[in-house]
Regions:
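ATP-dependent phospho-/nucleotidyl transfer catalytic cores
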Residues: 34, 109-171, 215-219, 275, ...
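Active-site acidic catalytic loop and adjacent metal/ATP-binding pocket
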Residues: 61, 154-199
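A glycine-centered beta->alpha junction motif in the catalytic cores
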Residues: 73-89, 120-130, 237-260
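ATP-binding glycine-rich phosphate-binding loop
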Residues: 1-26, 37-38
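ATP-binding pocket architecture of kinase catalytic cores
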Residues: 26-107
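Active-site Asp-x-Gly
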Residues: 180-226
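Active-site beta-strand-loop-beta-strand hairpin of nuclease catalytic cores
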Residues: 25-28, 180-182
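ATP/Mg2+ or Mg2+-diphosphate-binding catalytic cores
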Residues: 242-284
Length: 284
């Protein structure tokens, strides 16, 4: 379908998670299922804005036959993206740069319900196993404990901010791995959600894969638009670890992928203590 619809002739096609990708003349293309609620015109506008903002370093949508951007195959819709990304690590400025304001947001409440369900589902699923996943058994209580503290704090904030918080369009980092640099500049990875969530996910990315630049972190405390208590709550919730647990129990990933979370527990705790002190957060 790729050659017929896009006039591209890759020698080999690869699959990763729920997408396929291939190379033509050293250019990388990614095909994903299109499940966005927003219309294609809105997505194209966002793509063009990102391309201009990043000076040509964001991924772009590729039209097919008849200048159609959405391709239907076996009752599903797909979009083809050409990857234009700098081969470097993601920076805090990237997250700030791509954030766009949007009103009428209830993301905190939606995230709260999503997180509660995720933990319930994981705890239920793990009852099916005995000694199959020793690394999970050794670490799950610790990470769920942190996450439940985050849920408790988000619940308090959700009640206090009902119909008051301003929403944003943020860049979403879906996975913590060394191959996700291109995710940031992909228009399909922009979503309506809390700005603090984007910042928390960026910090997790730095802790688990790289190192924390504390000079860079000072910029967060200079931004008076950030709700530091909410950011702290999102830091407590271990979304990447828990998402990987789900994938492991579904045989989509190997258990060894959670090693980075286990090995960096002290580094993560040190950052939580640093952030709580800087933001004057008292959980007692």
């Amino acid at each position: 379908m790729i050659s017929e619809n896009y006039n591209l002739f890759p020698e080999k096609i690869y699959k990763k998670d729920n997408e396929i990708y291939f190379f033509v003349n050293d250019d990388k293309y990614v095909m994903r299922e299109y499940v966005k609620k927003s219309g294609i015109d809105e997505l194209l506008q966002l793509s063009n804005e990102m391309y201009e903002k990043t000076k040509g370093n964001s991924s772009v949508l590729i039209p097919g036959v008849g200048n159609n951007y959405v391709y239907e195959y076996k009752r599903k819709k797909y979009i083809l993206i050409k990857v234009n990304s700098i081969e470097r690590n993601i920076l805090l400025d990237d997250i700030i740069y791509l954030t766009r304001s949007k009103s009428d947001n209830d993301s905190t409440t939606k995230n709260l319900e999503k997180y509660k369900k995720q933990i319930d589902d994981i705890e239920t699923k793990l009852l099916e196993f005995n000694k199959e996943y020793p690394k999970i058994q050794q670490s799950i209580d610790y990470f769920i404990g942190l996450s439940e503290n985050g849920i408790q704090l988000l619940g308090k904030l959700s009640r206090e901010e009902k119909n008051q918080n301003e929403g944003t369009i943020i860049a979403k980092i879906e996975n913590i791995d060394e191959y996700n640099n291109e995710e940031l500049n992909n228009p399909l990875n922009m979503e309506k959600n809390d700005y603090e969530l984007a910042l928390a996910n960026y910090i997790k990315y730095r802790i688990y894969l790289l190192h924390v630049d504390y000079d860079e972190m000072e910029n967060i405390f200079r931004n008076d638009k950030i709700n530091h208590l909410k950011l702290y709550a999102y830091l407590l919730y271990q979304n990447y670890y828990l998402s990987d647990i789900v994938k492991i129990t579904r045989n989509k990933k190997e258990e060894k992928i959670i090693k980075k979370y286990i090995d960096n527990r002290k580094k993560y705790l040190d950052f939580l203590l640093y952030y709580a002190e800087k933001a004057k957060i008292n959980m007692k």
